[in-house]
Amino acid sequence: MLKILKSKIYFLLILTSIASCAKNPVSGMPDFVTITEQQEVEMGRAYHKEILKNSKVLNNKELTKYYVELGEKIAKSSHRPDLNWKFTIIDDPTFNAFATPGGYVYFYRGLLAHFNSEAELAGVLSHEIAHITARHAVRGMSTAQVTNLLIGLAASSVPGGSISNSGFNLLNQIVNKGYSRKYESEADDIAKEYLGRNGYNQNAMANFLKTMKSADDLENEIAKKEGSPISAGYHNIFSTHPSTENRIEAMNRTESIAGKKNKDAFLKMIDGLPYGTSDEEGYMRYNTFYHPFFAIKFSIPKGWDLKN
C-alpha cells in the first residue's frame, strides 16, 4: 500500500513539473496542462473518428466548401496557425457548435439558419477556434486529471478504494457540458480579436448571441406548452440566463471595428438549406407521413400530433 502511494505521489510531482513548463499559445503565460500538443492532436483525431461514426455529415458540397474555407482563413490568422485544422458540418437540426483539441471544429446544420451574415458565422467560428487556441479543453482535462489523482491518493489509503477515468471520458464530459463562464468569456474576447484580424464587424458575435437568446426563448415557450425538456441553448449558455446578458454587455463595452458583414453572400449560400429535420429523416404531406430511407408511409389521424 505504501509503495503504491509513493508511486502516485511521484507521478503527481512529474505532472506538476510538466505543467509548469507549458505556455499558453494565446497569453504566453505559464499554463497548467499535463497534456502535450502531440497528445492533444492525437486525442482530437481519435474523437473525430468517433464523431464521424455516430453522426451524419452534411451532403452539401458548395456550403461545406464555403464553411471550410472561412474556418481555415480564420484559423490561419489565429495564435495556432500550424495546427491541422478540420471543419465539419453535422447534418442535424440542433442549435449548437463545438470544438475539440487539436484543431477540430463542428457546426450543426440547425445552427446555420440562425446567422444573419457571414460576419456572425465568422464570429462563432472564431469563438470555437479560440477554445482550441487557448487550450480550454486541455486545461480543463489537466485540472480534472490532477484532481482525480489526488482523490485516488485518498482512495489508496482506504481498503478497497479505487478511482479511474480516461482522458477520452474527460473530453466527452467537457464537450457535452460546455465550458466554464471564464473560458466562454475568454473565447469571446479572442473571437473579437480574430474578427478584427479578418476585417469583420466585431459586434457580430454579440449580435448572434442576441438572436440565439430570442430563438431559445421561443423554443422554451414551445417546450413548456408541450411538456418537453427545456433547451440549454448554444454551448449551454442559456442554462444560467444572466450570464448571457453579461457576455453580450462585456463584448459591447470594448471598442469594436465596424468591418464587413457580407450579409447577402451568406444568405444566398444557405438558401434552400433544410430547417429542422431533413426530408431524408421523414416528412409530412397533408395527413400522411413518408420516410424515404425505410420506404414507408402511413396516415396520421385528425387531432394527432406527430413527433418524428
Positions of predicted regions on the chain:
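Membrane-embedded and juxtamembrane structural elements of multi-pass membrane proteins
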Residues: 133-180
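C-terminal motif of bacterial Sec signal peptides marking the signal peptidase cleavage site
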Residues: 17-20
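Short glycine/proline- and charge-enriched loop/turn segments
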Residues: 168-172, 226-232
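Metalloprotease/metallohydrolase-associated module, dominated by Zn2+-dependent proteases
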Residues: 40, 160-204
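A short glycine-threonine-serine/GTX helix/turn-capping micro-motif
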Residues: 34-35, 177-181, 234-242
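Peri-catalytic and regulatory segments of divalent metal-dependent proteins
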Residues: 22-152, 190-206, 214-229, 237, ...
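Secretory pathway targeting signatures of secreted, lumenal, and periplasmic proteins
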Residues: 297-308
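Bacterial N-terminal signal peptides that target proteins for export
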Residues: 1-11
